Amino acid sequence: MTVSFENKDFNQFINSSKFLVEYDVTSALEQEGLKQSDYAEICRRLNRAPNRNELGMFGVMWSEHCCYRNSRPLLKNFPTTGSRILVGPGENAGVVDIGFGQRLVFKIESHNHPSAVEPFQGAATGVGGILRDIFTMGARPIALLNALRFGPLDDEKNISLLEGVVAGISHYGNCVGVPTIGGEVGFDSSYSGNPLVNAMALGLMETEEIVCSGASGIGFPVLYVGNTTGRDGMGGASFASSELSKTSIDDRPAVQVGDPFLEKGLIEACLEAFKTGYVIAAQDMGAAGLTCSCSEMASKGEVGIELNLDLVPAREKGMTAYEFLLSESQERMLFVVKPGSEEELRELFIRWGLYVEVVGKVLKEKVVRVIHKGEVVANLPASALADDTPIEEHLLINSTPEYLQEHWKWTEDLLPKTLDDGIINIKNNLFISWNNVLLELLSIPSIASKNWIYKQYDFQVQSNTVVSPGEADAAVIRIRSQNDFSTKPKKDRGIASVVDCNDRWVYLDPQRGSMSAVAEAARNLSAVGAEPIAITNNLNFSSPDKAVGFWQLSMSCEGITKACLALNTPVTGGNVSLYNDTKLPNNTVIPIHPTPVIGMVGLIEDINKICKKSWVKAEDQIWMIGLPLENNINQDERISLSASSFLEYIHGLKTGRPPEIDLNLEKQVHAFLREVIKQGIVNSAHDLGDGGLTVAIADCCISSGYGANIILPPSQSRLDRLLFAEGGARVLVSCSTDQSVELKKYYKNISLQGSILFSISHLGNVNNQKKLLVSQSNNTIIDVNILDLKDTYKDAIHKKITK
């Protein structure tokens, strides 16, 4: 129960003889990001006032970053079970069974605020942290992905943030030897003061023994392994749980400093140590450092841990207990090991160039007891720190916020009438041809090629990358056995992975936008032939203390839940990042677009049958699977110019309600797509995303070098709607004439078996003329040279940065 105080009452409380302390409580609470009600609850639980070290421990462990005090009730509604799920939310990472004795471990996490302050180190340590979550479970890291958001690139500050973040990601990933195989990047003014850096990692394990974090074995030794502990990253968890301001932007000590070469040794040493059977439990030291690792290991194991800070390897002299406990120095682990194994493990870790010390033991009493300079400096119930943490009570508004009610009034009828060759641009009241509309959309950084970014990443290290960044709708890596003694898996299996979120859609309808993010991720996996298995999510939102902010978060969680249930993709865990707001000097607060990033993984049984997005040969037929281009498109709310890239970037309007998400239709389209890929009926596949039909066709042309002849059916629909409307459940495929016969035959056969919600539509043919030609009723609508499309698309971000 939340207790509220008048200032007078709180002063009386803290000055009472029972709770009197030597430090200034008010300033200490402000420093730790705690409320007066939190302090009263701490005193109630302890039946005494906390000392300054203990208050710091509560500050980080009761922060949103560590305990999800604002979001936990919403997360409980996610579907978390399934036939392949071995480990769900609550551990360092999720684990799914992919057959043949192999398990896939994966998770996504944010490093947003540190990257705003120090983009290189913030992004680099974000990569290091997510890798530790993976190998702490006993899995070898095999791939990295990322989802990034920045402000517009006409601002030098945003360019600097982009360059720093990309450099940090590439530095850490390249040095540690894990390929960065995919991701997504978006740009919007809402991220100008608060960029988003979400890192996802995948790992492979071939043992039945999953290393968990719950400590056990009374009296068993606690082992510290890895890097030394310094003063970097002090209070990082609390820092990540508050809005960014001019003061916090200057708070560089809250950003950690990473060493990827040491992490590489830590990976190998930990995996070797796990094979000995000596390790009972393992926990990496991420947010809240030693405090969090000790608290979580003790709480999950329903035991206690005694930690002697005098034995912790220190990087700097004169460190206080407070600094040891809250430091977030990187590349550190805490183990509980079997008695008698200490020396053997010590030799192992030293051989890999790591610090290793026995720093404590497991206790029967369920407390975290900390010793420094021979004295007990903290003694707290483990559950109070890591399990029985506060939950904020928010009143969920029961009506759509006013800003959305206004946006949802917008209709396509408010746009100028379309002409055969173009449209009047609302933004400046000038005519723009369809050719130039397409070129303009391809030059937008959110749509344009991200080759400037991914060419800085080593995506071929480990030699398992099957699909390189930008080649297909999802990244694909080969599953290569890590152990000679494992059950012999098929050599040609693969894992597909993707990260997705259309933040503009989520801003304009949090529930529909979030459903769409899940559906698009599943559609992208299906477009390479992968069966979606499960998701991890990163919920990036603004302050939940504002009614609209909490409503957005709640509606988003509802949308994710609905989509995951419909598409059979359980949630294995993830991360919540709140208070992504920028406070300007005039006290104006700018919230980011709500951005629930969906990381999804899928299984491919034969990587020789995957599809990329490029046309394969001239004269192939181009088909669209899903919603048809027919007269009734005007009445179909599943396809719309509302909330579209066309509306925002051509007309300067970010408005309207995003299209309806038909999850049953999505499921049918995905299953059909996977099957025709498996049967070898189609040569390429690409979903229709930002920019709609014409941008998707242009993308296929650019990546292949071939052109396309597209003939739009006669329609009463607006031309811009046919060309650039957006919506789900639509995929382009190409196939030969003979394959087209098989495509129609297979569609007819399944149509006879039951109710089919989608159609297949012949749109045209691949050509060798190096041109994209779009016509309707013998009128040429678009006629663009592929080289012009390619130059615009490939160089857009580079030109913005070097202008």
Curated annotation (Swiss-Prot):
Keywords assigned by UniProt, alphabetized: ATP-binding, Cytoplasm, Ligase, Magnesium, Metal-binding, Nucleotide-binding, Purine biosynthesis
Protein's name according to its UniProt entry: Phosphoribosylformylglycinamidine synthase subunit PurL
Sites where the protein binds substrate: 110-113, 132, 256, 328-330, 577
Protein source organism: Prochlorococcus marinus (strain NATL2A)
Any matching Pfam family: AIRS_C
Predominant location category: cytoplasm
Cell compartment(s), UniProt: Cytoplasm
Binding of Mg(2+) 2, residues: 133, 284
GO molecular function, one term: magnesium ion binding
InterPro entries in alphabetical order: PRibForGlyAmidine_synth_PurL, PurL_linker, PurM-like_C_dom, PurM-like_C_sf, PurM-like_N, PurM-like_N_sf
Enzyme Commission numbers on file: 6.3.5.3
GO biological process, one term: 'de novo' IMP biosynthetic process
Enzyme class: ligase
Primary role: Part of the phosphoribosylformylglycinamidine synthase complex involved in the purines biosynthetic pathway. Catalyzes the ATP-dependent conversion of formylglycinamide ribonucleotide (FGAR) and glutamine to yield formylglycinamidine ribonucleotide (FGAM) and glutamate. The FGAM synthase complex is composed of three subunits. PurQ produces an ammonia molecule by converting glutamine to glutamate. PurL transfers the ammonia molecule to FGAR to form FGAM in an ATP-dependent manner.
Binding site for Mg(2+) 1: 109, 575
Entry-linked CDD domains: PurL_repeat1, PurL_repeat2
Reaction it catalyzes: N(2)-formyl-N(1)-(5-phospho-beta-D-ribosyl)glycinamide + L-glutamine + ATP + H2O = 2-formamido-N(1)-(5-O-phospho-beta-D-ribosyl)acetamidine + L-glutamate + ADP + phosphate + H(+)
Pathway(s) of this molecule: Purine metabolism; IMP biosynthesis via de novo pathway; 5-amino-1-(5-phospho-D-ribosyl)imidazole from N(2)-formyl-N(1)-(5-phospho-D-ribosyl)glycinamide: step 1/2
Subunit: Monomer. Part of the FGAM synthase complex composed of 1 PurL, 1 PurQ and 2 PurS subunits.
Residues reported in the UniProt entry to bind ATP: 68, 107, 537, 574
